[in-house]
């Protein structure tokens, strides 16, 4: 079954946030720049191992989730290619939300700046500011995504929210992952 317009809108919002140079397509360099922005906003020195890991994780996100959707092999992903790739992946993956949640836990470590296993409002805000959101919008998103209202987002909450953002037809907290739409 093709994905709905609701999910297409969420995918489009994420697509335009990932497009760091605003050229209308996603390329590997967008993810390198995104990783660098996350590290810089966290105050991680550019020559450090943590900086390299953050950039590598975002480059890995390109390799794992985006590169395979390049239908014409030009090294660029259009919005149409992106939506078609997510649709194809969701249709052919058993338990797609659970599978996506498992993969999304890898991103968590790049955001968890203090390594305590949870995301604070400050850490999550810094992450979303790398995408271009304001601190206020990021904190509003955090309030929605902190499902148990503990004041932090656990690894499981993060992975579930991100997976549901991309794949769930249901309205709820996950639609706030990138600041609402």
Identify what each model region corresponds to.
Residues 8-23, 52-74, 101-115, 137-155, ...:
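Primarily EF-hand calcium-binding motifs
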Residues 45-53:
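Conserved GNAT-fold acetyl-CoA-binding loop/helix
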Residues 89-106:
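Short, structured interface segments that constitute the first stable element of a domain
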Residues 162-165, 173-177:
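C-terminal interaction modules of eukaryotic adaptor/scaffold proteins
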Residues 1-6, 61, 86, 91-93:
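Extracellular/periplasmic low-complexity linear segments
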Residues 2-44:
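The feature marks the first
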Residues 2-6, 56-57, 97-99, 131-133:
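Short helix-capping and inter-helix turn/linker motifs at the boundaries of alpha-helical repeat units
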Residues 27-46, 77-92, 118-132, 154-168:
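Amphipathic regulatory helices of Ca2+-sensor modules
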């Amino acid at each position: 079954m093709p994905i709905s317009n609701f999910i297409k809108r969420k995918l489009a919002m994420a697509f335009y946030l990932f497009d760091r140079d605003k050229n209308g397509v996603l390329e590997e360099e967008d993810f390198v720049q995104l990783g660098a922005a996350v590290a810089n906003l966290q105050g991680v020195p550019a020559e450090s191992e943590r900086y390299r890991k953050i950039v590598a994780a975002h480059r890995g996100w390109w390799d794992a989730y985006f590169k395979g959707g390049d239908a014409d092999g030009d090294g660029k992903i259009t919005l149409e290619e992106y939506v078609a790739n997510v649709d194809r992946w969701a249709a052919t993956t058993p338990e797609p939300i659970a599978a996506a949640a498992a993969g999304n836990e890898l991103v968590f470590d790049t955001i968890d700046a203090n390594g305590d296993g949870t995301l604070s409002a400050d850490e999550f805000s810094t992450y979303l500011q790398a995408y271009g959101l304001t601190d206020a919008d990021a904190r509003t998103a955090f309030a929605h995504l902190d499902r148990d209202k503990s004041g932090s987002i656990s690894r499981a909450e993060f992975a579930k929210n991100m997976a549901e953002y991309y794949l769930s037809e249901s309205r709820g907290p996950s639609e706030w992952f990138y600041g609402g739409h």
